[in-house]
């Protein structure tokens, strides 16, 4: 075929495939794909839309920044190996793993870095990744801020009060209500080691998920607004300890969750995918 149009099993595979097709070692081909997968993310200073040239030989891989104000350095190229990786030294593919633990980086010109030492470790069998997601419901989002120290100290009680008001309206099932407390544990949740040391200000994001937009909006609105009226010990007022940057809650994209995250061993990886050859043009 002169032109191939298809999906990709990984970003790196798009660039590794032609190198493998022309007989280059998988050790270098897969690293070539890895370094080129996000264009100039492997260069500095940052410029995500710029171009990088990758060169492969029997001995090494070389990455050169094409923009005159960018350069591929030892730090930028090796740092890109950590991109979207829980382990910066390895990346898994359908038929094996790229081991980067022994990579050596050499600055051979101002804009070019040379890479050696990568190893591709093939698996005995090819594994095809299966991923799936399912829609949970429609979603609305609301925001509020808290500056009052007493309310910050009792923010869980404030959230609990709001949840009870939603429960009084909708019961306990048929919707989801989520609170992210930024300034305390909004990013890491229960894994946050400094959860007992909140900041002097908190931002709370409220997400309501329900089968319909109307219900999701109301769940979110009640879950947000009722924080304003939360009853706390030692507070004589009836409202006012929460500030709202917006008058409304905002319609967001639908909520989805993972339903499938698996790999399946296959004897022939192409058996799962249809291939069509079409003659185009005159």
Name each model-derived stretch:
Residues 26:
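A mobile, often basic/glycine-rich helix-loop segment
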Residues 10-23:
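Short Gly/Thr/Asp-enriched flexible loops that form oxyanion-binding sites at enzyme active sites
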Residues 1-6:
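An acidic, phosphate/nucleotide-engaging active-site surface
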Residues 7-13, 211-213:
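Gly/Ser/Thr-rich loops at beta-strand to alpha-helix junctions
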Residues 124-282:
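C-terminal non-catalytic interaction/assembly regions of soluble proteins
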Residues 29, 33-154:
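A conserved active-site cap/scaffold subdomain adjacent to cofactor or substrate pockets
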């Amino acid at each position: 075929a002169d032109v191939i149009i298809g999906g990709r099993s990984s970003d790196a595979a798009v660039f590794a495939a032609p190198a493998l097709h022309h007989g280059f070692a998988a050790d270098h081909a897969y690293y070539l794909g890895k370094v080129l997968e996000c264009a100039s993310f492997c260069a500095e200073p940052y410029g995500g839309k710029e171009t990088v040239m990758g060169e492969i030989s029997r001995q090494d891989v070389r990455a050169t920044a094409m923009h005159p104000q960018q350069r591929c350095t030892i730090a930028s190229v090796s740092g890109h190996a950590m991109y979207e990786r829980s382990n910066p030294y390895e990346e898994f593919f359908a038929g094996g793993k790229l081991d980067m633990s022994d990579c050596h980086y050499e600055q051979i010109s101002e804009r070019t870095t040379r890479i050696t030492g990568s190893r591709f470790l093939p698996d005995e069998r090819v594994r095809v990744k299966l991923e799936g997601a399912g829609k949970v419901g429609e979603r609305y989002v609301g925001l509020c801020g808290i500056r009052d120290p007493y309310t910050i100290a009792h923010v869980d009680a404030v959230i609990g009060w709001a949840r009870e008001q939603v429960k009084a309206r909708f019961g306990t099932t048929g919707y989801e209500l989520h609170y992210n407390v930024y300034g305390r544990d909004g990013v890491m949740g229960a894994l946050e080691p400094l959860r007992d040391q909140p900041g002097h200000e908190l931002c709370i994001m409220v997400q309501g998920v329900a089968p319909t937009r109307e219900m999701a909006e109301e769940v979110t609105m009640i879950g947000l607004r009722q924080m304003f009226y939360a009853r706390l010990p030692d507070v004589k007022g009836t409202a006012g300890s929460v500030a709202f940057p917006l008058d409304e809650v905002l319609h967001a994209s639908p909520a989805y969750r993972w339903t499938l995250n698996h790999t399946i061993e296959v004897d022939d990886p192409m058996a799962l995918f249809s291939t069509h050859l079409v003659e185009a043009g005159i």
